[in-house]
Amino acid sequence: MFSLLKMIRTLALLACLCAISIEAFGTVQSAGVKGVLICNGKPAANVKVKLYDEDTTDLDDLLQEGLTDEDGKFELSGKETEITQIDPKLNIYHDCNDESLPCLKKFSIYIPKDYVSEGPSPRKIFDAGTLNLSGKFSGEGRDCLN
């Protein structure tokens, strides 16, 4: 019992030290994305959009989230401190042509690496263009917990 508590305490201390080292030795990086969402030719208002830094070893880091405006427009940006380059992606959660089914459709758009900036504010914003949500997107699935 004593050795188990000692091991848990050691692992907790190690996790804290790792988090501190990332902040101390990592680089602040940022990314941004904008676009317009439509559904059947009309603006898709109040669609949830989230900008993440995709991580392979732990949960993705949420950089910013928001909703499209009445014209279907959105713009998100955010920053994260990482030792390696961040991997930004945009998640879009919608129910275009799908209102009666449970959960929302979800798909991701990966932001090119040349849109990642060093520092707290992105130097350039990735323009995802106009996306018609009535179509099917590669990797599209359903998300009930967004």
Predicted regions and their residues:
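Classical eukaryotic N-terminal signal peptides for Sec-dependent ER targeting/secretion
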Residues: 1-16
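Beta-strand-dominated extracellular/periplasmic modules and repeats
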Residues: 16-130, 138, 142, 146
